[in-house]
From Swiss-Prot:
This is Epimerase family protein SH2119. NCBIfam families: yfcH. It comes from the Bacteria. Pfam families: DUF1731 (PF08338), Epimerase (PF01370). InterPro entries: DUF1731, Epimerase_deHydtase, NAD(P)-bd_dom_sf, SDR39U1. Belongs to the NAD(P)-dependent epimerase/dehydratase family. SDR39U1 subfamily.
Length: 299
């Protein structure tokens, strides 16, 4: 029986991953910030905000690090600090845990983000592209990956999953995007020409497990469907599935005024391709945006 250790295991991605893992011969230890009890013999909770938490963690074979404050809040100076520290400190805590253990994990899957890549209307990014921090979000990603790579000193295989926009019924971007269309005011955001790289939650969880299971999976992986869409077409497709108009236009300056620096997530975007997943033979169940929306939205 393999032992999994998961941070962020009660979040949008983590909860889906845990549900999938229940079908395997594994035991799952979930690190949380509160006291929780499990009725499932396959799942244990450890409150890692308490002293002595490390002694409650068994020997671990696979680590999945998803912990980090959400980006879907206004980026005040104090919240920007939380976005950074919540990722760095949790990852360093994991490094500290295993530096004291003789039994090292075989693999670490560490969440990351496509914010690693510079925004571009015309460039297509694969995992081969290398850069240095150029804004706040890219610095968060850069530092998070840098800390995760410390696991390599243990002989652990490290996978860096650069998440694109996650489409899910349980939270995330889709729930926010649906709101204006629900009230018949959805439409183009900014130029509408910016790219939206995306992935269905089902495919994301499958891709995470695929990279964990595949011994040839190492380094950065773009967790994105193979076909990105411009925002205007993305919104139009959502409108069609919801049977709503796609007619409103919100100029970029209003988006930046309303959202502040967080508007970069909506306006300053990237087109990324999952080349390494493709090369290893991963197949997407949802590579078509309309089909993905139809699966997630009750028309």
């Amino acid at each position: 029986m393999k032992q999994f250790l998961i941070t962020g295991g009660t979040g949008m991605v983590g909860s889906q991953l845990v549900n999938k893992l229940k079908n395997r011969d594994v035991h799952i230890t979930i690190l949380t910030r509160s006291d929780k009890q499990s009725d499932d013999p396959k799942i244990s909770y450890v409150n890692w905000s308490k002293d002595g938490w490390m002694s409650q963690v068994p020997d671990i074979d696979v680590v999945v690090n998803l912990a980090g404050a959400t980006l879907n809040k206004r980026w005040t100076p104090s919240y920007k600090q939380l976005i950074m520290t919540s990722r760095i400190q949790s990852t360093q805590s994991l490094v500290d845990l295993f530096s004291q253990r003789e039994h090292k994990p075989e693999v670490l899957f560490n969440a990351s983000a496509m914010g690693y890549y510079p925004p571009s209307l015309y460039h297509t990014y694969t995992e081969k592209y290398q850069t240095h921090p150029f804004d706040f979000l890219s610095d968060v990603v850069y530092q998070w990956e840098r800390f995760a790579k410390r696991f390599e000193s243990f002989g652990t295989r490290v996978v860096l999953g650069r998440f694109s926009m996650i489409l899910s019924n349980d939270g995330g971007a889709l729930q926010t995007m649906k709101l204006p269309y629900k009230f018949f005011v959805g439409g183009k955001l900014g130029s509408g020409f910016q790219w939206y790289s995306w992935i269905h939650i089902n495919d994301l969880v499958r891709a995470i497990l695929f990279t964990i299971d595949n011994p040839n999976a190492k380094g950065p992986f773009n967790m994105a469907a193979p076909i990105a869409e411009r925002q205007n077409l993305f919104g139009y497709t959502l409108a069609r599935v919801m049977h709503r108009p796609h007619e409103t236009w919100v100029p970029s300056f209003l988006m930046r005024l309303a959202l502040g620096e967080m508007s970069t997530v909506v306006l300053d975007t990237q087109k990324v391709l999952p080349n390494k997943l493709d090369a290893l033979g991963f197949t997407f169940n949802y590579s078509n945006l309309k089909i993905a929306f139809e699966d997630l939205i009750d028309a």
